[in-house]
Structure formats: C-alpha cells, structure tokens
Amino acid sequence: MAAARISFSSTSRTSYYRHSPFLGPKPTPTTPSVYPITPFSPNLGSILRCRRRPSFTVCFVLEDDKFKTQFEAGEEDIEMKIEEQISATRLAEKLARKKSERFTYLVAAVMSSFGITSMAVMAVYYRFYWQMEGGEVPFSEMFGTFALSVGAAVGMEFWARWAHKALWHASLWHMHESHHKPREGPFELNDVFAIINAVPAIALLDYGFFHKGLIPGLCFGAGLGITVFGMAYMFVHDGLVHKRFPVGPVANVPYLRKVAAAHSLHHSEKFNGVPYGLFLGPKELEEVGGLEELEKEVNRRTRYIKGS
C-alpha cells in the first residue's frame, strides 16, 4: 500500500498574442485597420501584449509501505542473526566451561578413588599378612572383618537415607541446597558431606590396621565397608545420575538405570522428596506407588542416552 503526498509549485509563463490578418477580421468591429503592422504602428502596444499567467504543477510523492516493511524486516533479520551469533558464542563458552568443570572433577575423583582404593587394598593385604605370620589363620577375625565390610556397606545406605531426610533436608539444608541448584564450578558445598563421611572410615581403618584382635578386625571391616559404599555412591550418584564425569559401561547396568531414574525423581519432588536413599531408591518408590513414574523416567533417560 502506498501513501501519496501532494506538493504544489508555482511558475510563470509568458504568452504573446498577435492577430494575424489571414485569420479573419479583428475582434474589434468598429475601426478596421487597413494598414500593415509596422514597428511605428500606434497600436503596436495593444497588439503585442505580454501577459503572465500563473501555472501550477502538482507533484505526487509516493511512499511505498511495502518497501518500508521489507526494510524493517531486513533490519529484524540482521538483529536476529546477531543475536543468534551471540547465543552461539555463549553456548560454546558454556559448553567449554562445563567440559572444563567435568574434567576437573574427574581428575579429583580419579585421584581420590585411586588413592583410597590403593590404600584400602594394601591395608587389607598387609593386615592379613601380619595376622598369619605365626602360622595360625585367625578365621574368626577374618570373618568378622568380611562381615562388617558387607554390613557397613549396606548399613550406609540406610544411614544415608535417614541423614538425607532428617538432616540434609532439614537443619543442614543450607549446605545441601547447593546440590539442588545449578552448579557453578566443578564443586559444590554439598561435597563436604563426602569428606565428613570419610573421616570415620579413615579412623576405623587406621585403628584396625595397627592393632590385632577381633575388635580391631571388626573396626577394620567397618571402615572398609564405608569406603566401598562411598566409592559406589560417587560413581552412581555423581557420575551416572548427575553426569559429573563419564562412567562407561556402568550406565548400561539395568538396575543402576533404575537407581539413576529414581534419584532423578527425588530432584523433581513428585513424591515429596522420595526416594531419599540411593541404591534402594526404586524400593522406596514402590512403597509410595511411584513405579509408573519410575518406568517413564527410565524410558526417558534411555532415549536421551541413545539420542546422544
């Protein structure tokens, strides 16, 4: 659609009027002229007359709204392209930062895991080696160590469930809250709980390693069980669920997929925070009627893994 603008300009034009004898008589019927027209004729002033008439010129200036719309659309396209470039740059920076954070946490996890695992293996080997130096095999002590190792690992699941609900989501929420928010940097304040749980494990291992007898053997087993649980918790919770580092074939274990899906439902708070435990999370959801949602979450995570 075009809009019209009208402008007027005024000009003047000179018109000369002269009566020709060949066109008939003059319009004045009273005194016909028989003399030819000469420069000395007395009527020359009336014959040759100069009259200026005003002349108006109308100019139409058209504004093409379509062209204006196209121009504005072109500006919008340029702005959108600039915004897309800025968004792409920010996305690339965010991905690079996330990659750096994952690498940093992976290095820390590998170093701590390798250090703790190697110390635990060496402690188990040398402890039983010293126990059998006299030729006698302390079966009761060895059985106690093994039993407490398994018992402590299983017991830590129930301890973690209780502490998670009664402490971390209550009086210690100011620390645990960092785990329920987008993480900034490779670490979060919630990681302090891993260090807190490592303190009794190290103390029990130390006492059981440097002492002989049934009680030191039980303490050594308890410290070993806490250590094993902490390692498994880190790989499943931090690696498989929150993808803070790659876990490899661990992600293909069917039950661990359910565990990861159950913990994702904990963060969604669909069942008032249930499950609070980790490895027995699917069982907790079954108790509150959340198996259907659990299956949906498992399928969603499976499609995501296959798509990526």
UniProtKB/Swiss-Prot annotation:
Q: Where in the cell is it found?
A: Plastid, Chloroplast membrane
Similarity remark? Belongs to the sterol desaturase family.
Q: How does it sit in the membrane?
A: Multi-pass membrane protein
The molecule here is called: Beta-carotene hydroxylase 2, chloroplastic
List the PANTHER family.
Answer: BETA-CAROTENE 3-HYDROXYLASE 1, CHLOROPLASTIC (PTHR31899), BETA-CAROTENE HYDROXYLASE 2, CHLOROPLASTIC (PTHR31899:SF10)
List UniProt keywords, sorted A-Z: Carotenoid biosynthesis, Chloroplast, Hydrolase, Iron, Membrane, Metal-binding, NAD, Oxidoreductase, Plastid, Transit peptide, Transmembrane, Transmembrane helix
Q: Name one GO cellular component term.
A: chloroplast membrane
Q: Which gene encodes it?
A: CA2
Location of the Fatty acid hydroxylase domain: 152-279
Q: Which reaction does it catalyse?
A: all-trans-beta-carotene + 4 reduced [2Fe-2S]-[ferredoxin] + 2 O2 + 4 H(+) = all-trans-zeaxanthin + 4 oxidized [2Fe-2S]-[ferredoxin] + 2 H2O; all-trans-beta-carotene + 2 reduced [2Fe-2S]-[ferredoxin] + O2 + 2 H(+) = beta-cryptoxanthin + 2 oxidized [2Fe-2S]-[ferredoxin] + H2O; beta-cryptoxanthin + 2 reduced [2Fe-2S]-[ferredoxin] + O2 + 2 H(+) = all-trans-zeaxanthin + 2 oxidized [2Fe-2S]-[ferredoxin] + H2O
Q: Which organism is it from?
A: Capsicum annuum
